[in-house]
Amino acid sequence: MVTVRPRRVRVVCWASAVTLLVVFSLVATSLTGATGDGYGSFQRGDQLAMVGLGVFGALGFLLFTRPRVVADARGVRVRNVIGSYELPWEVIRGVRFDRGAPWASLELHDDDLLPMVALQAADKERAVEAVRALRRLHQAHLAAMADAATPR
């Protein structure tokens, strides 16, 4: 079984989410009193709204920590930022990680490419090892299919 999650992106996203929440909270605490020459003034609701915006922004950053790839002898489960796919090995032609590509992808028999955002070039050798492990699982499945098709 192979399970992969991006490492570098998760660290950056968590740090960004915490920073954004802290900044919005600090801005919210500084919003008090009159707005200058106008008639408005900042109230408790305005402060809570700023904190709420910070929470929503942080959750937006944390969406990018969602990608994951889990593969076993039966197939591959790919969870990207938005959307999830569960594919048996029978529909997969190969595992690609082209030079210069930001992430690996699955090449399907219907000529579609399914990106695997969890296998990012930013993770360098860790991503390459994960792609090799996926290719080994795919080759093992192909060998098992060839053995099953051979008459005895």
What residue spans do the PLM features occupy?
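Hydrophobic alpha-helical transmembrane segments
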Residues: G40-G52
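Conserved beta-hairpin
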Residues: L53-P88
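Single-pass alpha-helical transmembrane signal-anchor segments
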Residues: S16-L26, A49-L63
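Short hydrophobic/aromatic-rich motifs at helix boundaries and adjacent loops
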Residues: T29-S30, G45-L48, R74-R77, W103-E107
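Surface-exposed loop/turn and secondary-structure junction residues enriched for glycine/proline
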Residues: R7, V12, A34, G45, ...
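N-terminal membrane-targeting/pre-transmembrane regions
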Residues: M1-F42
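Acidic, Ser/Thr-rich low-complexity segments on the non-lumenal side of membrane proteins
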Residues: V70, Y85-A121
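A membrane-cytosol interface segment of integral membrane proteins
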Residues: E107-R152
